[in-house]
C-alpha cells in the first residue's frame, strides 16, 4: 500500500490473531528422543509447506555445509509440499538434514518446543503480501527464530517488530549455519528471543488485542466522519 503512495496516516494495520492456544507443557527431551534428535544436536526446524516460494534448496545446501564442517547443526523439514521429493533427492542422504511428516496439533506444538531454533526460509526476491502463518505458531512456542529472507520483506519486518529472532539473507546457506551456531553458543540470547516472541504473541497477536485494534479503528473512523 505504501508503494502505491497512499498517505501513511491513511493506512492502519491490524494483524490476524493466532489460532493456536498457549502451547501445552511438554517434555522436550522425550519429544527429541521420539523424533530421533540427539541431545547434542542443534535442531533447526522448518515447518509447513515445501513449495517453490520457500526456496528450501538453501536449507539443503546449508545441511551439506554443516556436514562437511562437522557442525552440530541439524536441519529438519517438517510437513509436505510439491517440492518435498525433489528436496529429498537433492539432500542425497546428508546426516545433517531429516524430513518429518506433518504431525497432529499437540505433537506439532511439542516438536516446535523441542527444537532449538525455528526457521522461516524464503526464496530470494520473494515479496510476500502477508506474514507467513508459521510465524504465529513459532512465537507461541517460545523458541528463537531465524528468518532467511530479504531485507525489507514482510517477514523481516515482523521479526524486527517482535524481537523474536535473527534475520539472515535469503539464499545464503553459510549465514544460516552461523546464525544457528551463534544461538547455540549464546543460550541466554536464545531464551530472550524466544521470550520476546511469546510476549509479542500474547500482546499483539492475541484475539483480544486484534479486537481492541478493530474497536479503536472503528471509533477513530466514526469520530473523523462526525467532524
Spans of features found by a protein language model:
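Nucleotide-sugar-dependent
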Residues: 54, 102-111, 118-139, 144-157
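Carbohydrate-associated surface elements
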Residues: 14-17
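Nucleotide-activated donor-binding/catalytic signature segment of Leloir-type glycosyltransferases, i.e.
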Residues: 72-74, 84-109
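A short, well-ordered alpha-helix in the C-terminal region of glycosyltransferases
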Residues: 175, 182, 189-203
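C-terminal alpha-helical cap of glycosyltransferases
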Residues: 207-227
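A short helix/loop element that forms part of the nucleotide-sugar donor recognition site in Leloir-type
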Residues: 23-37
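Conserved donor-binding/catalytic core segment of Leloir-type glycosyltransferases
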Residues: 38-54, 60-64
Amino acid at each position: 500500500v505504501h508503494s502505491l503512495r497512499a498517505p501513511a496516516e491513511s493506512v492502519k494495520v491490524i494483524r490476524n490473531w493466532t489460532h493456536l492456544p498457549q502451547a501445552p507443557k511438554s517434555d522436550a527431551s522425550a519429544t527429541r528422543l521420539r523424533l530421533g534428535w540427539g541431545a547434542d544436536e542443534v535442531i533447526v526446524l522448518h515447518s509447513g509447506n515445501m513449495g517453490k516460494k520457500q526456496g528450501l534448496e538453501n536449507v539443503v545446501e546449508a545441511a551439506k555445509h554443516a556436514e562437511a564442517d562437522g557442525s552440530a547443526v541439524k536441519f529438519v523439514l517438517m510437513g509436505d509440499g510439491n517440492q518435498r521429493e525433489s528436496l529429498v533427492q537433492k539432500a542425497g542422504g546428508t546426516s545433517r538434514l531429516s524430513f518429518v511428516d506433518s504431525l497432529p496439533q499437540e505433537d506439532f506444538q511439542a516438536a516446535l518446543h523441542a527444537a532449538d531454533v525455528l526457521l522461516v526460509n524464503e526464496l530470494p526476491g520473494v515479496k510476500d503480501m502477508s506474514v507467513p502463518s508459521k510465524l504465529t505458531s513459532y512465537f507461541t512456542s517460545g523458541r528463537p527464530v531465524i528468518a532467511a529472507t530479504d531485507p525489507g520483506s514482510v517477514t523481516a519486518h515482523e521479526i524486527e517488530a517482535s524481537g523474536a529472532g535473527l534475520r539472515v539473507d535469503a539464499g545464503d546457506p553459510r549465514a544460516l549455519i552461523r546464525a544457528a551456531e551463534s544461538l547455540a553458543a549464546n543460550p541466554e540470547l536464545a531464551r530472550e528471543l524466544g521470550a520476546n516472541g511469546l510476549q509479542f504473541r500474547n500482546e499483539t497477536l492475541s484475539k483480544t488485542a486484534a479486537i481492541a485494534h478493530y474497536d479503536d479503528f472503528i471509533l477513530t473512523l466514526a469520530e473523523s466522519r462526525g467532524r
